Amino acid sequence: MMPLPAGVELEPLLAALKNLSWQAADILLAYARKPMELSVDKGGEGPVTAADLAVNKLLLDGLNSAFPAAPWALLSEETAAEQGSQIIESNEWLWILDPLDGTKDFIQGTGEYAVHLALVHQQRPVLGVVLLPEKQELWFGLLLDENCSAWCENRAGIKQQVQFSKRKELAELVLVASRNHRDQRLEQLLQQLEIGCSLTVGSVGCKVAAILRGDADIYVSLSAKSAPKHWDMAAPEAVLLAAGGGFSHADGKPLTYTSSSFLQAGCLIASHGISHPLLCERATKAMASIDPGFQV
């Protein structure tokens, strides 16, 4: 756990993040109701919409305006290609932003998309914000010296505490899985974990929120030809860890935000924490037979 950067106070920071988050929600909800105005670009590694770009500008401009002298840099999914890996290597404090996590779900109209904001110190998140516009949920996670806590609040500022389920046995656990990123190896792994049942939910932020609400207990990310990126994981990880849950590689090692390719490769497991060590042990053993040599 770490303090905030010099000259940055927690309460003004939280106020600014709340303001920016609900502005982002308004933008995304407006675009979601007018799909013909999305102007989708399918180039690169995934679809990018006008909504992505509008929220990206809001977040970058908003943080720069609210904290012009703060000793941090800003990295977002939409600017990573032009910024390059040096932004990670040369900054002790870094915001990692995803203006629209779950773009495919956003385009498909499932309502399962999120906005991620994570403040990272020396390659580890210390603050995370996950916004779910359609559910009007704003999740916060603080991993600070003076404050380690997580909560959810609505637009009116009414707070709700994390409510992990009490399910413990693997056969009781509820898996939250993606509808857009699944392959045969992942199906084999999930079968060997012998989880009770599953929910299909888009966006990493929405999946982790399902765990925080107690609707689900575990999420597994298994990289293949592609892998999730820093901006997919940083904010959800911060919120889940601050709540007392688990988020790690299957071998128990923590995620790090150092990769010059911005990749979070391997077998990543997020859970409500109760059964996390056993889940990691089972997953590591299973992957040794499913894909020998795979670095979990």
What are these regions (language model features)?
Residues 163-296:
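An extended, acidic
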Residues 63-77, 82, 144-148, 217-235:
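Short, charged helix-to-loop "capping" segments that act as catalytic/coupling loops
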Residues 28, 52, 63, 103, ...:
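Residue-level signal for inorganic ion chemistry
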Residues 52, 77, 98-101, 105, ...:
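Acidic active-site catalytic centers that drive phospho-/nucleotidyl reactions
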Residues 1-100, 188, 275, 288-296:
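N-terminal subdomain of lithium-sensitive/metallo-dependent phosphomonoesterases centered on the IMPase/IPPase/PAP
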Residues 35, 142-149, 241-243, 263-264:
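A short, compositionally biased
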Residues 86-157:
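DPxDG-like acidic metal-binding loop motif
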